[in-house]
Amino acid sequence: VKFGMPAGYSAATLGWGYYEFKDAYDSLGQTAHLKEITNRFSKYFKDCTTLSGDTVTNFCYQIGQGGGGNDHGYWGPAETQEAIKGKRTAYWTSNGASDIAAAYSAALAVNYINFGNAEDLKYAKALYDFSVKYNKSENETTSPYYNSYDYYDDQAWAAGWLYLATGDSSYKTFLDTFMNSSGQGMSGQSGCQWGVYSPMNWNNVSMGAAILQAEITKSASDWAKVTTYLDSKATSESQYYCEDTWGSARHNVAVQMTALITSKYKKESGKDYSSWAKAQMGMILGDNSTGKNLVVGFNENSPKYPHHRSASGHAYDPTDEGTPKWDAENGHVLVGALVGGPTGTDFSTYNDSITDAVSNEVALDYNAGLVGAAAGLYTTYKTGSLESSIPGVGATPTTTAATTTTTGKTTTTAAVTTTKAAETTKAPTTVAQGDGCYTKKVNQDVVYKELPAADK
């Protein structure tokens, strides 16, 4: 399933991390890899959008269905999902999904700022105009997942990036209004008149909008709306910050990232949360009462059973997700994925089980915050290095890496793209004998049944 809301959030958050901590990516040789990822997101968002001149006529906000007996009801790699192959519904709208249109807009705008693709800015402006024209939240789908509460915060987030990209004062005016509103939007969603009220996440990007506003104005009162919230969260360097039982680590790293950005501007914000963020990241990476860390493939104490279909290597069972026998270790190592984490402040509540989506699910939006926080910490402390012993880390970025998995037995890596070929003429597959790696040009088919056994 391609869910528009978390995709837009993840792409914009990745781009934001680069925007704030560019030197960290550059000094570690990660800029090309980051650009490859955000450009791929941006291409997808543009491909999902139909323009007539500079006006959006309609756009696709979701592909596939998350519920019932569709994608979410199937366990196994997408390549073997023959029953649904070619039959997924694409959800388009000509007058709604303002939240997702704004999320796409923000991601495209920040990618334009970072890397200068004029087409990204063109689509970002058009999607923003579409969003504020209709002021209507996500259209109805059969999916019960990632339903957004509102669109006002997403529009303000996009407006902030568009102002930075263009200098057009109309975007700044919209952001100003959001920052001083107490009740607007579809269901009376509050702006930030009384300050930030939620951690940065796919369903509420008010924190991001507020930080952009404070960066632009350099106003002590605008920064206070950010720091008052962060002060209430960054309270202990010895206790794990748990915002919510489900996917607590995702919220932890998102607050780390926003706290580190705020610390970057400490002359204006008056706050430095760097030490708190470093302590929290230490807990996530194993400095806790159990010694377990929450990043797959990081070391021997990493999660072994993340809730991820392709990485599991397990075959489909017609019964529901909770009943198959998941006694075998995952067939592939999903290197770098952040799992959900403890359900409380005590790490003993973390459960490394493939059937536990609360503690062990992985997601794009989880990792987006992790990457930004890591870049912020490296910028601040200038310590650490690329861990070359982890397969795939430190390698020259390729143009095809849509998914990277590592087989549990051979520790070989395989970058797989499952996108439909744009042309009928295909570049030959090259296989490096003995290491299980192969390469493909962008948008070329990978035929699952023809792959070497180790790569499957």
What are these regions (language model features)?
Residues 434-449:
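Secreted, propeptide-processed cysteine-rich mini-domains
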Residues 37-53, 122-139, 166-196, 219-240, ...:
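Long, well-ordered core segments of solenoidal/helical folds
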Residues 397-430:
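Extracellular mucin-like PTS domains
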Residues 1-43:
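N-terminal structural segment of carbohydrate-active enzymes
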Residues 1-17, 61-111, 152-170, 174-177, ...:
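Aromatic (Trp/Tyr) and acidic
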Residues 19-26, 50, 113-116, 136-143, ...:
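Short, flexible helix-adjacent loops and helix caps
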Residues 36-83, 117-122, 126-128, 135-147:
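Active-site acid/base region of carbohydrate-active enzymes
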Residues 136-148, 153-157, 164, 178-181:
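Structural signature of Gram-negative outer-membrane beta-barrels, strongest in the C-terminal barrel
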